[in-house]
């Protein structure tokens, strides 16, 4: 592994570090929201479940952004699309700070999710198409831990600034790092795989991309806008409108529909795993009576564990195989649940958060390599992002469900967190065990 990393040249390191920075700062902007559920609920005089809908619409909008921006990346290149995506979601992050009502915040977070959806798939493709195959396992773990690093940064900013600047100030702070990542991408060269295939692609292959993009945006905004107009719950509208339309996107990958459907199901389980253990954990800690500093510190410790687990299992997947690395990590998470969800002291909860973070992100550390190795080469800009973000869409209602379940149990989040982690870990182990693997596949050539 170390030998393959030493063989990477400046172009390959540049693409890897840029993709990592983009995903880290994307996640930073997303996770700022989860620390502020109670503060936003208090300002707008609603319950926490109503505010969690803002995160639900963000997740539900992401696959439509992934599809649209992925198509643009397959047509115009990875690098320019990534820069546009970062500028867009930075703008909507800033606008969120000035939301006059919860309704306005819901719509802004849907726009944010649509823009954010374009980052992961395109960024991962740029990196995976640029680096040597033998470095892919470690780089996969490294890239995916950008999400944990973003969460860690959000925890630290919450710890240091929230009591001074409030939730609106937090959104303003969130803009600056994202703009820095856009500047980083200006120094990155285009994917060699895209450059090699530029002259072999059919001129009409993406001719309807802009029309499809408008449709995708309208669908992404539908749950938030229709909820405001009709009073129906956001979750109901997500599964009634976004989910069927999102799954219809499989038609664009109809030549590979079996693997696309399998990976969408797998990524639904993975997103249930990550968001089900991360998004409400700060709220859970607050419900136990811990203050801003204690919540921020415990969450930061959990994300240090996540970074360690992702790097370790990403690298080990080169020996264990992609599937077994994910299975082992999911199995470990089950053993950690009692310490993570039912401890009574901050020290034990922080230790549990470290171990759960390592287990959950250990399984996630394999995902960028696994998806890109299984993706068809002619749509690698769109395919990994689509199946990943479809998982986000299908899992998006979980956070509202967990908050509602906790409310029904007198505000105790322990049961909701524990049942989610246990059931989903078993589900992942089963899905991955019977799935395919193409470890070490050549991503620089066209697949038949």
For each predicted feature, which ranges?
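Helix-loop-helix hairpin linking two adjacent transmembrane segments in secondary transporters
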Residues: 143-186, 204-208, 224-236
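Extracytoplasmic gate region of multi-pass secondary transporters
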Residues: 33-34, 213-307, 395-399
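Extracellular/periplasmic helix-loop-helix junction of adjacent transmembrane segments
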Residues: 34-64, 293-294
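Cytosolic juxtamembrane N-terminal segment immediately preceding the first transmembrane helix
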Residues: 1-30
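Helix-breaking motifs and short loop linkers at transmembrane-helix boundaries and internal kinks
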Residues: 45, 77, 98-104, 132, ...
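Structural signature of the two symmetry-related core transmembrane helices
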Residues: 80-94, 324-339
